Amino acid sequence: MPPPQHPPNYYAPRRSISTITGPNRRDVDAFYQNNFPEKNGGSSGEHVPEYQASGQQHRPSIMSGQSHQNNHLPTKNYSYEPLRFSPPNVTPPPLQFSTNTDGNRKNQRVRFNELPNYSTPNHYSVPPRKCSLAPNFFSSQNSHHMYPDQYTPRTWQNNEFMPNHQVHPYHANHQQQHPQQHWRNQAASNGNHNPMYMRKHSAGHGIEIKLDHVDNPFGNPSHDMMDVTSGQPVKSEMLSPIKMETTDPSQQIASPSFLMTSTSLLKQHLHKKSHHNVPSRKASIMALKSQLRTPRGTPLNISTVPGTELPYTPPPILAPMRNGSGLFCQIVKSANSSLPVAEQSPDAPSCSTNGVDGDMKHLMNGKKRSEDGDGPSRKNGFFYMAQQMNQTNFANELEALRKESWASTSSADEKMQTERKESLESIRKASCMSDSYYEIEEGPKISDPNPHINLGKNYQARVKKWCDRQVSTSERDAIEDRDEIVFSSEILQDIDPEQITAFELLACSQACPRAGRNKELALHLLMENKGNIEAAVEDLLRSDTLDWEHYSSVFGYMYNDSVLWTPDEIYQFQDAIYQSEKDFDKVAVELPGKSVKECVQFYYTWKKDCPDDYRKLRNLRRKRQLLDINLQKNQSEEPVVPAKKISIIESGDSDNESNATDSSFIGNGHMEFRDRAFTSPMMSSPREEPIIGLSPSSKDLFGIQKNYQPTAPRAHHTPSASASKKGAQPSADGFFHCRLCDKCFEKVKSLNAHMKSHAMKARAEQEAKAHDAQVAAAAAAQLTSAVGNVVGNPVATSPLNSFANGHLGISIPSTIGNLTPQQLTPQQLNLNQQLQTQLNSLSNQMSLNSPLTPQQQLQQFTQQHLMARAMQQNLFQPVTSTPLVQPTHPLIQAGLHSIN
């Protein structure tokens, strides 16, 4: 059979698995132009020609939008809306059967000219949509399930643009009564080409509808059609939205149970409401909001009693008895899979997607199986019901369909194309025209969206009774009452308020020997003595020797400040709290006899009773925070130079000192030079010993130096440390310490005023320093003249020489001058040359009459001292980087102090 022919202006819409559209206006116009040219031309008065032969009749296209009716589907009225994406709406009346048989089946046609021609209102238009996942043709507005496995378009409710006689007569909102219609069933004959039809007998219009014919592909289950694109034969049971049964259609019509089923299902759908301008859930998956708050179910999983209110499930919890998958769906399926099918609870949360058909059957592995097939109910975002596709290879075809949808963007295997037994286009058409294309929530509501308290044993906790019996009154009375009255104000009614005040003051005074004196203890004792204030006073005064076990309210109770603290412990606590900044673990370490809890408790008492000390702690914390901030800034800007190095650098002019000044001579242990070249006068004071071997001039010089020795130290407290910092900074303890004395101040202003007194002392010290420098210069001149005599006469003729280097504390052996160069070793010759060179340089310097500073004089004196030492030991030590050590001779000490 050749494929149906289309007019030249007919364009089949493009369809794929991702975008499926219904018949548009062009499809509907082409449909009417092809099948009803007289009606489309507006000739309502002309008669439709008689039924044509099967070879001359043009069959309507599959996707043209023509309503497909079953062989037992009558029609009542005709209404066509060109602005809707839907075919003409055909409303079926309730079925009424009769036994009247008539063999006249010649005029098997629909007389549309006998129907009233209602003009379409032009003042109402629906804006066309450009793209839609599923048009309104598949929405619940136009598809109303009246009978099982049957597709019938549905009209709108209370549509003001539709005549009243086009509304369903069974609708609840319809108020107009229609005339009673009588239907007469005319039995079918046994011939294949003698179809069964129904005739309507009415006082008004007469309609004859052909239901079953050899050329009707939608009414004949055994007839196969040709695909539009491929030309392959397509089974009509795949294309028709009506589920084809293998039984005789006449038996289904004659069955009275069919009417009861239709009526019961019709009542279940009466509660559904729709609007003509709002797409339903079928039209778009994301068109409506979530329905989880008001789920629907089947009578199998409704646990509520009829007549009671629906249970409420508060968000975000989902209703446990809802349809569809959820949080606990896998748990329920795994639990049900471990049990036989007969033992599974019917009240368990359902994971099914079809509530009308009662699809609650589960396999042993926990998966849901369909009623008519075991194919999937959803694939690649679309809902395909296996019960509509009564085939065994439906899953394979659906998988092939999914692979085909990706063929445009990826290289799919061509072998999948050859394995298909049915056309992909036919499957898409069947899915579009199928009534179960999208999942619909069926059945009554099982959850109430309005919040309320759920009543009933199913929603309340089941608490097991105590020992499975009730507690008797005697047993309740036998239970000991653990509540104990500690204090009651009734005992104060018979006591004078002045006595109570005096008693409280006594408890807080030092007359109470027990630690933790407070009013709470006094009131407890008054309660224990039952309001006898005299007995309470006696107990309070002997609280240190009282047996507290007889007082249940006082025994074992920890009162505030009940730990005794001695004054020494309080001082230790203050020092520890100042240093640790409220680190009570460290405070407890400083106080061995106290725990951390006791230290914390005493801290709040000390804070309240000693506000001045607490204010000091608060200032310390604030100053430490500022100090930390300043230290971080200084470290980020430049590295901090240690104060010790600064004092050493600024103590003297290292550029004017020679290498001999920094050398150490390893001889006797008492002549070593140490790190501290300049120490306080308390550590380097001259010893009160007679100096042996000194000349009278040397003794006088020592006496002058002793008398004019500076009293204030200058090397120990150097102003370099204060000059290195910008502004005074608090110490670690939070105080501002004076760098010249041991005084400390809380404020910077106090420290600045104190430093002014040090400045006055510094000026006086500078004047004394200048006077000491003059005296030291005179002493150095005398010393230089004495050394010059030694240089001028280097060879002494006798060890009893009057000078004999006695002022240096060294005796040069006289044998050196009597030795000849041949008798000296090479080492001695080298030493003699070096010493002679140094002595010549010293003599040249002293020959000049230029005045020398005390520091230069001390340098020359030190060199002479080293040369004399080398002559005595007959050894030469290399110059090292070790600084000079304080010598023991008082003259050198005087020179060092004069330099400072």
Swiss-Prot record:
Residues 560-611 form the SANT domain. It is found in: Nucleus. Pfam families: Myb_DNA-binding. Residues 358-377, 412-425 have a biased composition (Basic and acidic residues). Residues 1-75, 340-380, 406-425, 710-729 are annotated as: Disordered. One of its GO terms (molecular function) is zinc ion binding. Residues 451-544 form the ELM2 domain. Residues 53-75 have a biased composition (Polar residues). A zinc finger (C2H2-type) spans 736-758. GO terms for biological process: negative regulation of DNA-templated transcription; regulation of transcription by RNA polymerase II. GO terms for cellular component: histone deacetylase complex; nucleus; transcription regulator complex. The keyword Transcription applies. As a likely component of a histone deacetylase complex, together with saeg-2 and hda-2, functions downstream of the cAMP-dependent kinase egl-4 to regulate the expression of genes required for egg-laying and foraging. May be a component of a histone deacetylase complex containing saeg-2, saeg-1 and hda-2. May interact with egl-4. This is Suppressor of activated egl-4 protein 1. It comes from Caenorhabditis elegans. The lineage of its organism: Eukaryota, Metazoa, Ecdysozoa, Nematoda, Chromadorea.
